[in-house]
Amino acid sequence: PAWLKALPAPADGKLQPGQTYAGIPVLSQRLKALGDLRANGAPPARYEGGLVDAVKSFQERHGLTPDGVVGKGTLEQLNVPPEFRVRQIELALERLRWTPLLPASRAIVVNIPEFRVRAYEVRDGKVEMKVAMNVIVGNAAKTRTPIFDAEMRFVEFSPYWNVPPSIARGETLPRLRREPGYFDQQGFEFVGRDGRVVGGFSEASLDAVQRGEMRIRQRPGARNALGDIKFIFPNPDNIYLHHTPTPQLFKRDRRDFSHGCIRVEEPVALAKFVLADEPDWTEERIVQAMAKGRSATLRLREPFPVVIAYTTAVVRDGRIHFFPDIYGHDKILDDALRQRSQSLSASGLVEIGVKSKY
């Protein structure tokens, strides 16, 4: 009954605490059904008290800022029908069914739609989450972060950033032609095929980069696109975890701003986990290496798995959380499963399972 009709849009576009709202009875009923509102009795006359707290709980479970304000994003999520959420859970379980058991004592897992990374440790047969933080992933429209797994092998302090050719041609070169001063401002340098730094800024060097005869590299420093630490798990797509000079973006609800690599909110905490088997690498030493301004790479004694995953339904502390299907992978998987089921039904066969890259 709580979903027989959609919640109406607030009169001013946003429902603020203390305001009146025609949809309060339906909102209360819906939040009770979802388990976010535990109060009994008649709905309040105004949007206040326990109802605001229930909306905050709902927002927290759906990747939204828990401010209690019912704006466009919160209203959209509140109007999602239960059958859609059930399907999200089914798709999450389907993906989990494919996931191999990792024979490792440690692992890092990034969940793209959740914009979160978690680091796990296995002790005495029990899995313990040691670190969890927000991340920024690849832009959904242009540069999606791929789904894969690899082994963490290196940590690079004060890294150089070698501007990928696609970014150089599509973004960096056009800007440098418009704003030559941007070259020194960002700490760029030209590097030849032999790895040597080639002079300063010149139009000839820009043309050489365009032809693929040179590359642009950003020196370590405060403006470096990778921040002051990079976590390397070699893979064909050259995806890695790294810090960022623009931490303010972590305040956003939706965080798909990168060119594909994954930016981490708390690099020191992640470094402490990654280097836990290196007793000489204390937090103080990590911070010093990050601030040194001179690139240095450390090879890990024991590589361990890094999994870049994709699921829009997650259980945290016994509560289900849902996230938008930012890359459309749920829709692709849903369509594939339904088509397969229809095909098997038509042929009289029983479905055993299906695996997909989504």
State the predicted function of each range:
Residues 1-358:
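Well-ordered beta-sheet/strand-loop patches within structured domains
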